[in-house]
């Protein structure tokens, strides 16, 4: 076993200390380059999403107003229109229709996801309404399940009630809301604004996907919504 004596001017110890310093310096430079590369990558992604607003500065300016006679004088205050325009551009960047035209499987999955989201939304909404009126929801669930099955949605039957396998939230809303929140977080401070942006996101998505239903036997989201509403209204009107 080698015994190390800690003398102040021991050459061996000094040499062992300087070598790691060079390695550490090299590692530090390499890490800095990696961090810079990642940072530049995300800057490019963000620039791509906001490109429309940079190239159309005049349009954006017309959708803002300014505080005058205060500390914030001259600073643009964003309006809902600017945020909604950004969400619309984000939807165009996702390019649902373009992807669907190139990939039939993607188109089919998109149609099923959209109609399943419509089913989930209105099932919950009308179940709560029927329950509040003291109406048994079992027949309603059975009938809207049959409507979903007739619309061509895949799913499973349990206790004589069909449920679409993809029932859940609209999968395209989250990307729009997340992108808008990341760019304009101060526009999502109130529940009213959040709800307004969610409604708008759903509206433009439903409009965007309509052409995907033109070449198949499935009802459009709007038609399927009307089918569910008609079923619910029948139970409400026939309630004692």
Curated annotation (Swiss-Prot):
What's any one GO cellular component for it? extracellular region
Which residue intervals make up region (GEF catalytic domain)? 78-240
One GO BP annotation is:
actin cytoskeleton organization
Give the superkingdom in one word.
Answer: Bacteria
Molecular-function annotations in GO = GTPase activator activity; guanyl-nucleotide exchange factor activity
Would the keyword Secreted turn up in this protein's UniProt record? Answer: yes
* Main subcellular location: secreted
The alphabetized UniProt keywords are: GTPase activation, Guanine-nucleotide releasing factor, Secreted, Virulence
Location of this chain's protein in the cell: Secreted
Which Gene3D superfamilies does the entry mention?
Answer: SopE-like, GEF domain
List the InterPro entries. SopE (IPR005414), SopE-like_GEF_dom_sf (IPR035949), SopE_GEF_dom (IPR016019), SopE_N_dom (IPR016018)
Q: Which SUPFAM superfamilies match?
A: SopE-like GEF domain
The miscellaneous comment for this protein is: Encoded within a lambda-like prophage region with similarity to GIFSY phages.
Per the entry, what this protein does is: Activator for both CDC42 and RAC1 by directly engaging these Rho GTPases and acting as potent guanine nucleotide exchange factor (GEF). This activation results in actin cytoskeleton rearrangements and stimulates membrane ruffling, promoting bacterial entry into non-phagocytic cells.
Give the family this protein belongs to, as stated in its UniProt record: Belongs to the GEF (guanine exchange factor) SopE family.
Q: By what name is this protein known?
A: Guanine nucleotide exchange factor SopE
Biological source species: Salmonella hadar
Gene that produces this protein: sopE
